Amino acid sequence: METTVKNSSSDGEWKVVLPSKGRQGRRRKPKPKGQAEEEEQPWKSDDLEIDPQRQARLKQKMEISLKKIESSSFYTAFLEQLKSPEVSNQIRLVLGSETQLQMVMYGIGSIESYESPRFQLSIAILMKREFDWVGDNIEVFDPVLSATESSYLESLGCSVLSVNEQARREALKPTLFFMPHCEANLYSNLLQANWRMDRLSKIALFGNSFQMYEEQVSFDAEVICATKRIIAAQRVTSEFAIETESDDYFAAFHDSSWHFFSSGIDSELPLFVSD
């Protein structure tokens, strides 16, 4: 019997999110994944007008989300995990001789339309306030962002990227990639762009559990292609799952983990024919 890799869905099922599936907070129409879609491209929002009234309403929504997250037991547990010896030691290894991680957020979704993206952005902002090792400038990209959303993000001190990197950024310096509930191919793109230990070791990744991808098997060719590098990376990955017991934050953060990469005596990265 065929089983599927699972992730976020309205009925609670966990399945791989492929580019044609979309996810909460995305307004683009489904389209097949082609060569051009996988390449880095200059980007401008389809919604070019900055609406002051919409921006004021968005600011109010974000203030509510920030306060709700900051006062929650979920956030308390989130901070405790980051400050634990196991995770903080991993962060120190990623930092190396540097003092800060550059934070890059891919696939945030529409913060104007949906609460889950606002919760995810709130966590990133609160991390920046809490930890000196989070860089001052948070870089953000999602092709669904409107001009109003981009303007608001910039008012928070974020930089909205003008190029769709397809998550193919090389980690030339210590980088925190903040990618909760992104499509599987974006994690694969990130890994492929950094498929050498001196690059992977500079990455802290917050996103879908790699272990979950490995545990759930599929015979679908597209799913196998999207997840093969994720599964191969497991041999050099230290994963720390976060707790999402509260229903309020389950949709935004369920099955999310911290991932760090380091090679051991008996582990090395496999070669892929496509590389």
Curated annotation (Swiss-Prot):
- Work out whether the entry's keyword set contains Cytoplasm: yes
Keyword Protease assigned: no
Where does the record say this protein resides?
Cytoplasm; Nucleus
Classification via Pfam families: SRR1
Q: Where is this region: Disordered?
A: 1-49
What InterPro entries does this protein's entry cite?
SRR1-like (IPR012942), SRR1L (IPR040044)
Q: Which GO terms describe its cellular component?
A: cytoplasm; nucleus
Q: Give the keywords, sorted.
A: Biological rhythms, Cytoplasm, Nucleus, Phytochrome signaling pathway
| Feature: compositional bias, Basic residues | 23-32
**Biased composition, class Polar residues, residue ranges:** 1-11
Q: Biological process GO terms, please?
A: circadian rhythm; red or far-red light signaling pathway; red, far-red light phototransduction; regulation of circadian rhythm
Which superkingdom? Answer: Eukaryota
User: Residue ranges for motif Nuclear localization signal?
Assistant: 26-29
Entry's induction text: By light. Not modulated by far-red light.
| Family according to the record | Belongs to the SRR1 family.
What this chain does, per the entry, is described as: Probable regulator involved in a circadian clock input pathway, which is required for normal oscillator function. Regulates the expression of clock-regulated genes such as CCA1 and TOC1. Involved in both the phytochrome B (PHYB) and PHYB-independent signaling pathways.
Protein's recorded name: Protein SENSITIVITY TO RED LIGHT REDUCED 1
UniProt source species: Arabidopsis thaliana (Mouse-ear cress)
Task: State the organism's lineage.
Answer: Eukaryota, Viridiplantae, Streptophyta, Embryophyta, Tracheophyta
